[in-house]
């Protein structure tokens, strides 16, 4: 997913030869960095490099044959250690400007419980939930009673993973324990959330910062393979889901969801870009589901589709994100800090 997103971003930016010289960097699952000739999966011709903290260079070949001074980094990376504040913190340590949310917003956005708490404080409706911790253990009977009280189904989700990894729909209380055990394979904390009958999944994209935020048209994703938008429907089954942009919802409802998307993004202290996901019931009531602070960026991803529906040019959005990254870095550099 990260590779597909990065390929699109690299292609669009590489077409702007008067503005950018693009250096694609591949990071392996082992954490090793490689400079690529063309953005894509790992290739034998990729050059091993290492990030360094120097005034004259940020990236140096392991054989010493070359070095690069990066003006800005576009961390088109998804998942653990990528969009959860880890990479952002590393780039802060290198003192390199980078696109997207900072350490705090990235970390909070990746945590489903923290982002729900922030959404609630921002006045955005959320669904009831419980947290299960691997370390603390859990009272299965109490959780089953809570699930029955809320009304089945409930959804069990790892707290700090993507929207589809490790997720199970629990239709009976007898299924709850196996769903918890499954999710706890992927994270130390698990969210048990009340389900929504006949839920529609509505999305809104955001870019900018502070008072200069733009929200996209709302889009809807319908699952073709399976009962909900799980990992199988998202990545495995061809045509497992269908996207409709703009979503077929009343204009006033779409406007309210856009406003709530902006409210969550601002409350999270977001900067750069994000996609905010909602669940809507059959009566038109909607609830915040999660925020993705580095959404998919490929041509078929929701982020470019949602802004394209508003007449926004993808290349200009990328230009704006890079310019914002430079402004944010300059603003931090101007602060009086005791280092």
Features from the language model and the residues they span:
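ATP-binding N-terminal substructure of ATP-dependent carboxylate-amine bond-forming enzymes
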Residues: 1-104, 108-110, 114, 132-145, ...
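ATP-dependent carboxylate activation and anion-phosphoryl transfer catalytic cores
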Residues: 248-339
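Phosphate-binding site of ATP-dependent enzymes
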Residues: 171-259, 280-287
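Active-site nucleotide/adenylate-binding loops and adjacent lid/helix of ATP-dependent enzymes
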Residues: 4-7, 11, 67, 108-199, ...
